[in-house]
Amino acid sequence: MRDRLNEFQSRVTDRFDEVELSPARPPSAAEYVDRRFEEVRNAIASVRGEIEKLRRDQQHVLALTIADPRDKNILENQIGTIRRRTGDLRKLVRQAEDDFLEFTKQVQSVTEKRMRQNQLELLKDNLNKLINLFNETHQDYKSRVSVRVRRQLQTVGQDLTDEDINRIMENSGSEQLFFREVNPLSVSGQAAYEDVKKRHGEIKDLENNIAMLEEIFLDLQHLTEAQDEMVTNIDNNVENGLEQVKQGSANVKTAVEYKKSAMRKKICVAAILITILLILIIVAIILAVVLSRGNNNNK
């Protein structure tokens, strides 16, 4: 009994050894571009969640009587993370556009191309809405902080004029005043420091503008390359269409010639048949006359 069990187990093992797993099927062009679109959708949803969390945290900070400077670092880290992820999301959308162009080259179905073109446009529209949401959230927060700081300066600094308040707001920054990083009442003692800080802020703004311009130029370059390829495809399609029209015109002329030739052949055949029929009739008449004369002579 034990030997039979061992023999059965060995047979089962041998059968499993003979089984070979078939290689995984590579994804099709449609599956690949759909996966890329799904990746972009998930990334947009994730960044939108981070923006909503940033808005809640900003509202929490604005509700505090005295803001903690550590909250500022937390908010700045969140804003920096959102900006980095937004930049990564733009690159991901450009990759999705490239994948869609490859998809259009491999797929002939107009319906599938149009469907995925609409999906791509929707993703780009959602990205623009996401960027606008982030900018509106940040601008709303800065505006509310500025209003609160101006109210605090007007309450605390009885000897400050509107010009002093505006200068403090512009040079020091409303967020710095909000988080107690600058003393609003020491205006004259920090004039030099504020001037240096203002110049430093101008340099940082210039660097940010240069980086933004570089990104804009990269986007324009990408769009130009994509449009150049589209124009080339249109030119090729026009040339192919012209060749097909010429070929069709030649085929039509050939068909007309064939039709004329067939008509001439039919006329010739009909004339021959009529001639043969006339000859047969004449022969029959002659035979009838000859036979009738022969009968008369016999009588």
Curated annotation (Swiss-Prot):
Compartments reported by the entry: Membrane
UniProt keywords, alphabetically: Coiled coil, Membrane, Neurotransmitter transport, Transmembrane, Transmembrane helix, Transport
Record flagged with keyword Transmembrane: yes
Main location, first listed in the record: membrane
Membrane-protein topology: Single-pass type IV membrane protein
Membrane-side (Cytoplasmic) residue stretches: 1-270
Disulfide linkage: none
GO molecular function list: SNAP receptor activity; SNARE binding
Extracellular compartment segments: 292-299
InterPro entries in the cross-refs: SNARE, Syntaxin, Syntaxin/epimorphin_CS, Syntaxin_N, T_SNARE_dom
UniProt feature coiled coil, ranges: 112-146
GO CC annotations on file: endomembrane system; plasma membrane; presynapse; SNARE complex
Residues that span the membrane, as ranges: 271-291
GO BP annotations, alphabetical order: exocytosis; intracellular protein transport; short-term memory; synaptic vesicle docking; vesicle docking; vesicle fusion
Pfam entry (one): SNARE
t-SNARE coiled-coil homology domain mapped to chain residues: 193-255
Gene3D superfamilies xrefs: 1.20.5.110, 1.20.58.70
Protein family according to the UniProt entry: Belongs to the syntaxin family.
Matching PANTHER family: SYNTAXIN, SYNTAXIN-2-RELATED
Function: Potentially involved in docking of synaptic vesicles at presynaptic active zones.
Protein name: Putative syntaxin-2
